[in-house]
Regions:
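Di-metal (Zn2+ and/or Mg2+/Mn2+) metal-binding site signature of metallo-dependent hydrolases
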Residues: 55-94
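Histidine-centered active-site/metal-ligand motif
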Residues: 36, 70-75, 118-121, 192
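Short, Lys/Arg-enriched N-terminal segments with co-localized hydrophobic residues
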Residues: 4-27
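Cap/insert and terminal regions of metallo-dependent hydrolase folds
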Residues: 147-223
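Divalent metal-coordination and catalytic microenvironments
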Residues: 41, 70, 111, 143, ...
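P-loop/Walker A phosphate-binding loop and immediately adjacent motor/lid segment at beta-alpha junctions
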Residues: 36, 78-99, 182-194, 212
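Core dinuclear metal-dependent hydrolase active-site scaffold
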Residues: 27-61, 65, 93-155, 171, ...
Length: 223
């Protein structure tokens, strides 16, 4: 009765609001961590984005977009991902062309390619991504160390920075914390934290970054 009264009181747009928040529940974008450098983002409307598929489980949800930061085998196993018809695969090849970092708008999801590089990763063959979904800005660094681009990220007002920190193939935890402070995202998540392992919580807890959000494999959070 109360819901019906609110619908009548608020009119058409009010009815849409009531149906969404009182009847259907509030839908939110989510992030599911698979392990190593792999994770999945789902928008509030059900659009699914896989990032650097390789590790763990949870590839059975049909994807709309698959992002590959570079062509190392622990980041590019796109065959693992279930796909919706018309699923778009964007790898470093499409994202970085002739020295130009491209931006894609796919049904309202914006994918901006940015720099990624270190001594183990050629800057011409690697990218990171800034993903905007439901107005939430998420930086997925790929395999990298500190880059020149990062000095501009604070102005982007990122909601999440997802950073690597294994200290072997990529920057270590100390440099990753330095990057987190430079980027100034509202929340920071460390992944790709130990070579050959899905995750290491003890190392993640030692990460001295502001607003450190720890996510373990097979854990999902609301963004």
């Amino acid at each position: 009765m109360r819901v019906f009264f609110l619908q009548r009181l608020c009119g058409f747009y009010g009815m849409m609001f009531v149906n969404k928040y009182f009847l259907g529940g509030l839908r939110m974008a989510k992030l599911f961590y698979q392990g190593h450098g792999s994770f999945r983002i789902t928008s509030s409307s059900g659009q699914v984005i896989y990032v650097d598929p390789y590790a763990g489980e949870g590839y059975d949800v049909p994807g709309d977009i698959i992002l590959v930061s570079h062509q190392h085998g622990d980041h590019n196993q796109v065959q693992l991902c279930a796909r919706k018809p018309g699923c778009r695969v964007i790898s470093n090849v499409e994202a970085l062309e002739g020295g130009r970092y491209n931006t894609f708008n796919i049904d309202g999801i914006v994918i901006e390619a940015v720099q990624a590089y270190n001594k183990n990763h050629d800057p011409k063959e690697c990218v990171g991504f800034i993903i905007t979904v439901d107005g939430i800005k998420i930086y997925a660094c790929g395999d990298t160390s500190k880059t020149e681009d990062m000095s501009t990220f604070a102005s982007k007002e990122l909601d999440y920075a997802i950073l690597c920190g294994d200290g072997f193939y990529n920057m270590g935890l100390e440099e990753a914390a330095e990057c987190a402070r430079l980027i100034s995202a509202k929340n920071n998540i460390i992944i790709h934290v130990k070579p050959g392992e899905l995750f290491d919580r003890e190392l993640a807890e030692k990460w001295d970054a502001p607003n450190n959000v720890i996510i373990e494999p097979n854990q999902e959070i609301s963004l």
